[in-house]
Design a protein with these regions (language model features):
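Accessory nucleic acid-recognition modules appended to NTPase machines
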Residues: 1-137
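Catalytic cores of nucleic-acid endonucleases
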Residues: 144-180
Length: 180
């Protein structure tokens, strides 16, 4: 139906960003509950997946919003009718983030690795694209297509001693998805 197409397109335009069901409901013209139902259906059909915020109750960590990604970035690109090469795109960072996280999920699943997956962000807009918790081990990853460095959020490292933050870029991604 038209509502589902509108919702999918809205989600496709928001990959890598926090998503509000209330905002989506307003964009699509349906209730928040209808948006939630469609999102659950799309998840069960393995079209999209959600990442919730990682928080251990620090006052300045986001706790309510979520990010939604597509398992297949080709479907995402078809929804927004953008098949341009990376050099001609304005959404490279978000597309790279989506691709890396979806490939990491496949990597973990194919090896039977159980991981809790999140993103992390503070009210001061410090963020980490992907946080993975396996057992008691906390690993954080920042995805950058072109950059070779980034500023690690000290507040995260201080709040979660023993955790590590790694950069995943086009030169290092193979290790992250297990193909090196």
């Amino acid at each position: 139906p038209e509502v589902l197409e509108k919702l999918l397109k809205a989600l496709a335009l928001q990959i890598g960003c926090e998503v509000s069901y209330n905002e989506l409901a307003g964009l699509v013209g349906v209730s928040k509950q209808t948006v939630e139902n469609y999102v659950q259906l799309l998840e069960k059909a393995f079209i999209i997946f959600r990442l919730g915020p990682f928080s251990r109750n620090l006052r300045n960590e986001l706790k309510k919003l979520r990010k939604i990604y597509f398992y297949d970035t080709g479907i995402r690109n078809a929804l927004i009718n953008n098949f341009n090469p990376f050099d001609l795109r304005t959404d490279v960072g978000n597309l790279w983030e989506n691709f890396m996280i979806s490939e990491r999920i496949k990597y973990n699943n194919s090896r039977g690795l159980d991981a809790n997956m999140y993103f992390w962000r503070t009210t001061q807009k410090q963020e980490i694209d992907y946080v993975e918790e396996k057992g008691n081990v906390l690993s954080a990853f920042e995805f950058k297509w072109k950059k070779d460095s980034f500023k690690k959020p000290k507040i995260f490292l201080d709040a979660y001693p023993g955790s590590a933050i790694e950069l995943v870029n086009k030169g290092s991604y193979k290790k992250f998805i297990g193909i090196d």
